[in-house]
Amino acid sequence: MILFLSIQVSVSQILSEKDRAILKDELLEDRFQNLLPQLMDDANLDMWLLISREYNEDPVLKTMLPARWLNARRRTMILFYRNKKQNTIERIAVARYDIGKSIKSAWNKELEPNQWKALSDIIAKRNPAKIGINYSKHFALADGLVKTDYEELVKNLPDSLVSKLVS
């Protein structure tokens, strides 16, 4: 016996590509404002880093990008800083450009040509107690920080900050 299911969908119920992009970006902003602070608090993280390269993205990174971004660009660095006293989350791109409307660029390549040094300076200025990075022996989706980027991160951070890295 073969069963056929018929789903009736009117054209008016399907969002246009533009409207889907708007909805996705609204949902992303909601996650940044409401879900991310709680998750960082639950994990006892003051800071969380996402570092990816074009064509080799951290699986989590794609869930943090706006609708019109399909991938990382060159080396994409995103830093989330949770200030519990002020109940805020800074969303910073260590990139030459903003990542959509939700993540603002904090790197001026003309003033500091070294992206890793710029990242290190931004982290040091905030002096977090715990810095989350994505690596895991047990969960593939939590193992997005590639070895090369991990080594560059450790090489460019002062020892006082390297000791604060956790996964």
Where are these regions (language model features)?
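A composition/biophysics-driven feature that prefers long, compositionally simple stretches
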Residues: 11-167
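Bacterial Sec-dependent N-terminal signal peptides
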Residues: 1-13
